[in-house]
Amino acid sequence: MQFLPLFHKLQGRPVLVIGGGEVALRKARLLSDAGARLRVVAPEIRSELQELAGADGICLRGYASSDLQGVALVIAATDDEPLNARISAEAQAQGIPVNVVDAPALCSVIFPAIVDRSPLIVAVSSGGDAPVLARLIRAKIETWIPATYGQLANLGKRFRDRVKQLFPDVQQRRVFWEDVFQGQIAESVFAGKPEEGERLLEERLAGAAPRALGEVYLVGAGPGDPDLLTFRALRLMQQADVVLYDRLVAPAIIELCRRDAERIYVGKRRADHAVPQEQINQLLIDLARQGKRVLRLKGGDPFIFGRGGEEIEQLAAEDIPFQVVPGITAASGCAAYAGIPLTHRDHAQSVRFVTGHLKDGSSNLPWKDLVAPGQTLVFYMGLVGLYGICEQLIAHGRSAATPAALVQQGTTQNQRVFTGTLETLPQLVAQHEVHAPTLVIVGEVVTLRDKLAWFEGAQGSL
């Protein structure tokens, strides 16, 4: 190990930055965030850097050895290599930590790549050998640690002394904090409810038993590509005890769930419901009452034709804790991967999402509104009733030559896209054996696919 990771408290302490350009500015921003008192020396100094240092911290001249007097840290950020080497030698001779930007051999300290969730700080370093790799690893860590971890750390800080008094034994304290940071208290903070998290922690310290009640996570899995999951969705997927998933959730996404979680298929298709909706609702309640963390995983977005509202209505009625994580809805994801912008200044000023399968099985849609000019229509679950949809749109005034598209299994390697018109779309379904899940897009924007298509599945498109 070439460098020992340490954290340097710089609040109120003088730090010398030699250099006045972009590199010096980047270092100065970081030092300012840490509360350091900046002293910047350079013949020319950028205005933003001058603002950071203040009038008393600016010296518009070259470096002098006397500048090192009384400083806690030195940063050499000039493009003069001999000068940088001199600064390094003089600082180290006086026992002052020194960092020479992009010259690890001249450094006694180096800057790591930082994930800032203050007061929680994560530092990643390659010892100066591969800084780009360190930044890439930092980016991965950024996705694993929600921004609200800082709030959770602050909550722990406020209660630390009380917990220490209550649990003098180190092992007992460790078990207590592990439960806090991995359980309902932490989830309340992550869900944007810090007051609830603090209340639950107060209850625990007052002697209340841990809640036996679990929680339900209603999570949108997006249209199929696992890369389109949100950070929060992925985190909850990896900590749930039980997963209830729909037919439209891609297998690759299900595989990202916790390995030892129980998986329950509750998918539906037309006239074939593996588990009736009422039974799904009750199952969510029963599992949560067993103290389990229950993931309800739905394709697309749970609040757009996903019956998510119905499910959480039941949870709310039974006082079951829940949180909702939106997902990229099929219209957005599939249209983007098909190269079809849903709105465009020259073609469509609005877009409508329409279900092609209503609760009573009818197609009683506001057809007069749906044929208004300047809009794009996106039909979910419209494949079975496609002939009737096209017929009604034409009958109510939409031109039979209106461009239209079918996007099957959009955003995945199995994606297929077929373009035609309202008149020819039903024929394309039969000709190419198109099957669900397929999205129907109607409007002039479909013509842009010829220029904007950028993603093709393994089976190609027409």
Swiss-Prot record:
Pathway noted in the entry: Cofactor biosynthesis; adenosylcobalamin biosynthesis; precorrin-2 from uroporphyrinogen III: step 1/1; Cofactor biosynthesis; adenosylcobalamin biosynthesis; sirohydrochlorin from precorrin-2: step 1/1; Porphyrin-containing compound metabolism; siroheme biosynthesis; precorrin-2 from uroporphyrinogen III: step 1/1; Porphyrin-containing compound metabolism; siroheme biosynthesis; siroheme from sirohydrochlorin: step 1/1
Binding locations of NAD(+): E22, V23, P43, E44
UniProt-annotated catalytic positions: D246, K268
The protein, known as: Siroheme synthase
UniProt: S-adenosyl-L-methionine binding residues: P223, G299, G300, D301, I304, T329, A330, M381, G410
PROSITE patterns reported for this sequence: SUMT_2
Assigned EC number: 2.1.1.107, 1.3.1.76, 4.99.1.4
